[in-house]
């Protein structure tokens, strides 16, 4: 730790003293948490109070984790490959289609255990707007389960039962956007300037037109363009996916802190893996496709360090539907290797795994992407997504 950072850390550790394990992890990963955030926000006067609030939330989360979660934190600290072992078997489903409710999922855990499942990914289950809602990815409340599925208490009980059966629980957290009906967006519509600053909005078409010169359309048929005029705001809102999904503004350190706390709260329910939805889109830049920007990886590095300090049992899975040569970066590369996400979707490989048996042909699987170069004959990767989706 650099001397100037050591002095800063000492003040933080003194303020948050009380949990020896937390303080030890904080010292170990403090630089990994601090440095990317300083690079992103260091010149922003809002940063220091938001960073202090984040540290407080991390300390509170670590303190509030029950004995079983603390034990799991310790176990996974000493076995960091727990998610990558060859014995792992994953099962992905929609809770309502599989068992009706979260309680129904609990009742079917013996069946999943019989199958050898060690990892259960329940597709989006947080409260979403009424349809259309992008298959549940237009979230109105990160702190509430979709009412038809149950409650947050049901989610906690399910997570505990899964642990008892030796299974991990994965849930989706939508980082790029919220539904228009989310409390933050509603506050913005009501005139709250602070909450308006949570979103990417523009008073005219000057900047949107500049961005759209190089932006691909995700849903050109049903939601053309990447900006939506909102009369109540008299502003253009960035809407990468649908008009009802408002993109968050991660140049605002308060947004980072708020979404980090969403992740901490989900970790407190006992969730083991957070599937980070649409992560390539988190940072926008004129003259690019506003995907896979370097700042996206700095955000992920800070979130990974946060989890290692406050909730070390929790892993990250990146939903980055990008070309294979761009995908590896979401696991961390160079000096950041292993410091972003633990898993990432390989969309090309997934498609090949399905197309090979259906076409009764395996030749195209032999070289899905040559090392160090683009895939031969590969069409532009689809940047959109369809519901249901992985």
State each model region's role.
Residues 371-390:
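Active-site-proximal substrate-binding groove within the catalytic cores of carbohydrate-active enzymes
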Residues 315-318, 360-377:
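Phosphate/diphosphate-binding loops
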Residues 1-251, 256-257, 264, 268, ...:
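Acidic/aromatic-lined carbohydrate-recognition and catalytic surfaces
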């Amino acid at each position: 730790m650099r001397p100037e950072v050591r002095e800063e850390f000492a003040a933080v550790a003194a303020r948050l003293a009380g949990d020896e394990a937390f303080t030890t992890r904080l010292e170990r990963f403090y630089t990994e948490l601090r440095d990317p955030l300083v690079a992103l926000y260091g010149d922003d006067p809002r940063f220091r109070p938001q960073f202090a609030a984040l540290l407080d939330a991390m300390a509170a989360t670590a303190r509030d984790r029950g004995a079983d979660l603390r034990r799991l934190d310790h176990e996974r600290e000493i076995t960091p490959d727990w998610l990558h072992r060859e014995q792992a078997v994953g099962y992905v489903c929609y809770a309502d289609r599989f068992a009706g409710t979260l309680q129904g999922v609990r009742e079917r855990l013996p069946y999943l255990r019989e199958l050898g499942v060690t990892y259960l990914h329940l597709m989006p289950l947080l409260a979403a707007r009424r349809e259309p809602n992008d298959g549940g990815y237009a979230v109105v409340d990160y702190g509430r389960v979709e009412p038809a599925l149950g409650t947050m208490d049901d989610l906690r009980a399910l997570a505990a039962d899964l642990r008892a059966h030796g299974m991990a629980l994965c849930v989706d957290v939508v980082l790029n956007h919220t539904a228009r009906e989310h409390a933050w967006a509603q506050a913005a519509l009501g005139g709250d300037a602070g909450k308006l600053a949570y979103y990417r909005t523009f008073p005219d078409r000057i900047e949107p037109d500049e961005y759209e010169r190089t932006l691909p359309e995700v849903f050109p048929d049903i939601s053309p363009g990447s900006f939506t005029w909102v009369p109540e705001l008299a502003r253009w809102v960035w809407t990468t996916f649908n008009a009802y999904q408002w993109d968050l503004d991660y140049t605002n350190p308060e947004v980072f802190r708020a979404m980090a706390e969403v992740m901490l709260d989900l970790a407190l329910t006992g969730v083991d893996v957070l599937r980070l939805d649409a992560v390539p889109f988190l940072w926008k830049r004129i003259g690019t496709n506003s995907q896979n920007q370097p700042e996206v990886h700095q955000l992920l590095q800070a979130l990974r360090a946060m989890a290692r300090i406050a909730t070390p049992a929790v892993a990250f899975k990146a939903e980055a539907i990008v070309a294979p040569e761009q995908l590896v970066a979401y696991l961390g590369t160079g000096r950041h290797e292993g410091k972003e996400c633990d898993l990432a979707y390989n969309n090309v490989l997934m498609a090949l795994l399905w197309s090979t048996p259906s076409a009764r042909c395996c030749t195209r699987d032999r070289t899905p992407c040559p090392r160090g170069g683009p895939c031969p004959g590969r069409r532009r990767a689809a940047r959109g997504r369809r519901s249901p989706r992985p």
